[in-house]
Amino acid sequence: MPTIQQLVRKGRRDKIGKVKTAALKRSPQRRGVCTRVYTTTPKKPNSALRKVARVKLTSQVEVTAYIPGEGHNLQEHSMVLVRGGRVKDLPGVRYKIIRGSLDTQGVKNRKQARSRYGAKKEKS
């Protein structure tokens, strides 16, 4: 326990919290190249084949990123834009690929939440 005089001299240090998206190096997004595109199964109560990709970022870190939406055109060597955001039922997946930017196409026939999936407005 410090004395009052020690606190006057030195003060208290703020604790530094852990960054959840370390590979982005404090950027909102980062560009990367897909090294492997595959499917994986989620944790216990859920059942599906979730689409994910291993991506080597421009920060020289390789991460696993989730491909949101139905259907995708990604393959090895595709250029993608990656943002933070984990997938709760996939352990180790802490990043998501942004649809509709670089080599990633938007989701076809998407009516709601279009901006999240890079889908253009349909002509009526």
From Swiss-Prot:
The modification 3-methylthioaspartic acid is found at residue 89. GO terms for biological process: translation. SUPFAM superfamilies: Nucleic acid-binding proteins. InterPro entries: NA-bd_OB-fold, Ribosomal_uS12, Ribosomal_uS12_bac. Keywords: Methylation, Ribonucleoprotein, Ribosomal protein, RNA-binding, rRNA-binding, tRNA-binding. It comes from the Bacteria. It holds the Pfam family Ribosom_S12_S23. The keyword rRNA-binding applies. With S4 and S5 plays an important role in translational accuracy. GO terms for molecular function: rRNA binding; structural constituent of ribosome; tRNA binding. The keyword 4Fe-4S does not apply. The gene is rpsL. It comes from Mycobacterium ulcerans (strain Agy99). Residues 105-124 are annotated as: Disordered. GO terms for cellular component: small ribosomal subunit. Belongs to the universal ribosomal protein uS12 family. This is Small ribosomal subunit protein uS12. Part of the 30S ribosomal subunit. Contacts proteins S8 and S17. May interact with IF1 in the 30S initiation complex. Residues 108-118 have a biased composition (Basic residues). Coiled coil: none annotated. CDD domains: Ribosomal_S12.
